[in-house]
C-alpha cells in the first residue's frame, strides 16, 4: 500500500513538473521528510524488483484492454514499433495506438547504437502478441522495420501488418523481372496496389501485397517521393488508413521528451531508466485518458485555450489537456479563501463562477 501511494504521488508530481530528473522530482515530492530522504526514497523505489514491465505494466494493460470499445477501431488493435535515442541511450518500443497518440506497451533499452535487428524486433513484438492474445492486431512500422523477413514472421492468424519499404527494395513484376520500387512509375497524385507480389531476390519469402502512394502535398508542402507499404491487407484504402496511425508513436516520443516529461534529462543508467519509463507510461496513460474524459465532458475550455478550428491549426491532444488539468486544479486548491472572496466581490460574474465550480467538480471526478 505504501508503494502504491508513493507511485500516485510521483505520477501527480510529474504531471506538474514535467521533469524526469530525480533531484527535481525530490524537491517537489509532497512527503514531509528531509529533501535528502526524499531523494533516497525515490532511488530505492526505482530499485524495487517488483517494478518491472511484466509484473506491473502488463497487469495494468490487461485490465485496460477489457474496455475493448476504447482501444479498438472497428475490432482492430493497432500497435506501432519504433525507436528513439539520445546520447548513448537507444530504446526499441512497441506502443498501442489510442486517441491520436500511442501508449507504451513494451520496450527494451538496446546496448548499442543504430537500428535494431530482426531478432530484437521479433523479441519485443513476441512479448506484445502474448499480452494482446485474443485481439485482432495490426502491426505498424516505418522503413527501419522494412524487413521482408519480419513481414513473413508476422503472417499469422488474426494479425495484420503495414511496414514501410525503402524505394530501393526489389519487387518482381508480372514478366518475372525484378525492379526497384522507385521504378514502378508512381508520380505525384497517383497510387497503386499490387497483390501477391514477390519482394527481394532472396528465396523462400512468399508473396505479399504492396500499396504505394505519392501525395501531391503534405501539410502544405510538395512531397519529394512516394511511399510504399508491405501489407497483408487486401485493399489500398485500408492499408493507407492503417499506415497513417503510425505517426501517433512519434507524437508520443515527443511528449516523452521535450513536449512533456523531459525523459532525456533523467541521466539515469539503463537499468533504472527502464523502470522510470514504467512510471512515465502510467503517468502518460493517466493524463491521456483524463484529457479524453475532459473533452468528452465538454469542459476542455476551462483547462486549456479554446481551439480554433481553421485549417492548419493543431488541436490540443488529450495528453496536453490531461497534463494541464493538474496545474489548474492544484492552484485552485491552494487559494480556496481567495477564490471565495473574489466570488463575493464580483457578484455580477457569479453565474460564470458557479459554472466554473461545476466544471472543477466534473474534472475532479476523473481522478
Role assignments for model-derived ranges:
Residues 15, 29-32, 36-87, 141-142, ...:
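Active-site- or DNA-interface-adjacent structural scaffold in DNA-acting proteins
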Residues 26:
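The alpha-helix within a helix-turn-helix
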Residues 1-21, 56-58, 72-77, 88, ...:
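Single, function-defining residue in the core of a domain
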Amino acid at each position: 500500500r505504501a508503494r502504491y501511494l508513493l507511485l500516485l504521488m510521483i505520477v501527480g508530481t510529474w504531471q506538474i513538473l514535467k521533469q524526469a530528473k530525480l533531484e527535481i522530482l525530490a524537491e517537489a515530492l509532497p512527503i514531509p521528510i528531509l529533501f535528502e530522504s526524499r531523494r533516497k526514497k525515490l532511488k530505492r523505489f526505482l530499485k524495487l524488483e517488483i517494478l518491472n514491465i511484466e509484473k506491473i505494466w502488463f497487469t495494468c494493460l490487461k485490465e485496460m484492454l477489457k474496455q475493448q470499445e476504447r482501444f479498438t477501431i472497428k475490432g482492430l488493435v493497432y500497435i506501432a514499433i519504433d525507436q528513439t535515442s539520445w546520447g548513448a541511450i537507444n530504446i526499441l518500443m512497441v506502443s498501442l495506438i489510442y486517441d491520436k497518440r500511442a501508449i507504451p506497451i513494451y520496450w527494451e533499452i538496446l546496448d548499442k547504437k543504430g537500428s535494431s535487428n530482426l531478432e530484437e524486433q521479433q523479441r519485443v513484438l513476441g512479448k506484445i502478441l502474448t499480452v494482446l492474445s485474443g485481439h485482432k492486431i495490426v502491426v505498424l512500422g516505418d522503413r527501419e522495420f522494412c524487413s521482408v523477413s519480419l513481414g513473413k514472421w508476422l503472417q499469422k492468424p488474426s494479425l495484420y501488418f503495414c511496414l514501410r519499404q525503402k524505394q530501393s527494395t526489389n519487387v518482381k513484376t508480372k514478366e518475372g523481372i525484378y525492379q526497384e520500387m522507385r521504378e514502378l512509375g508512381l508520380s505525384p497524385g497517383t497510387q497503386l496496389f499490387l497483390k501477391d507480389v514477390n519482394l527481394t531476390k532472396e528465396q523462400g519469402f512468399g508473396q505479399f501485397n504492396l500499396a504505394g502512394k505519392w501525395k501531391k502535398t503534405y501539410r502544405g508542402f510538395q512531397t519529394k517521393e512516394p511511399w510504399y507499404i508491405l501489407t497483408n491487407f487486401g485493399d489500398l484504402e485500408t492499408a493507407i488508413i492503417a499506415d497513417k496511425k503510425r505517426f501517433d508513436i512519434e507524437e508520443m516520443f515527443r511528449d516523452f521528451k521535450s513536449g512533456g516529461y523531459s525523459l532525456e534529462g533523467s541521466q539515469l543508467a539503463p537499468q533504472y531508466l527502464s523502470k522510470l519509463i514504467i512510471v512515465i507510461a502510467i503517468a502518460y496513460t493517466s493524463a491521456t485518458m483524463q484529457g479524453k474524459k475532459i473533452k468528452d465532458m465538454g469542459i476542455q475550455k476551462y483547462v486549456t485555450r479554446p481551439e480554433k478550428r481553421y485549417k492548419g491549426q493543431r488541436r490540443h491532444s488529450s495528453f496536453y489537456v490531461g497534463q494541464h488539468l493538474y496545474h489548474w486544479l492544484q492552484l485552485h486548491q491552494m487559494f480556496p479563501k481567495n477564490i471565495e472572496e473574489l466570488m463575493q466581490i464580483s457578484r455580477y460574474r457569479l453565474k460564470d463562477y458557479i459554472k466554473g465550480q461545476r466544471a472543477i467538480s466534473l474534472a475532479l471526478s476523473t481522478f
